[in-house]
Amino acid sequence: LTLGGTGKTPLVTWTARQCLAGGSQPAVVSRGYGAGPGQTSDEAAELALVLPGVAHVADRDRVAAAAVAVSHGARAIVLDDGFQHRRLARDLDIVAVDATDPFGCGHLFPRGMLREPLGGLARAHAVVLTRADAIEPDRRREIVAALADLCGRRGPQVWAQAAHAPHRLRTTSGRELPLDAVRGQRVAAFCGIGNPAAFRRTLERLGAC
C-alpha cells in the first residue's frame, strides 16, 4: 500500500520458488521501473540472479505481459507491485506491509507514502508484515490489530511475518565472505533500494561502522 521499499522483491522471489516447488512453472510480471526500451532494470537483473529459469516479463501493460508469459509456458503469474493494477484478474492478493512504517505516514502521496487509503487492505487475501524483526513483539501485535480493524470483517484471512536478514556477503568478483567480515570495519554504503534506511540498519547490526 505504500511507496518505497517494503520488501516486495524478496516476497516475489519466495512466492515464485513456492510455485516451482509445487510443480507450476511461474513467470514474474512487472512494470519495469527504471528501464528504458531495450534495457533491463536492476530489479530484473536481481530476479534473474536469484530465480534462474523463471521468466521476467516487464511491460506497462500488465495484461499484455501476462499473455506473453502464458504463451511461453508459464502456469502461474507472480505480479510484482500490482495490488492497484486491477485490470488483471488474480487468484490471490498478497500485500507486503513494512513493520517500520506500516501506515505510510497516514496520508496519501505526496503528503504521505500511501498509494491508496489503508482500507484498501481489505481486498488482500494475505498480509505479510515485513522487517518484523526490526520492532518489538508488542508493537507487531499492535500493528496487526490496527490494520485488521481498518479492514473490518472482510479483511485478509492470513497474517504472516517476515524477517529480512542477510546470510552471506559477496564481493564484486563473486567471492563469498562470512557476515562478520565487516564487523568493526569502516564502510561506505551505496544502495539502490526504496528503503535505504533499512539497508543502513542491516549494516549496523552486522557491526559495520
Language model features: what each stretch is:
Residues 126-139, 162-169, 190-195:
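G-domain G4 guanine-recognition motif of GTPases
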Residues 25-26, 93, 159, 187, ...:
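Hydrophobic anchor at the start of a short beta-strand
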Residues 103, 166-180:
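A short, charged helix-loop
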Residues 1-35, 134:
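Walker A (P-loop) phosphate-binding motif
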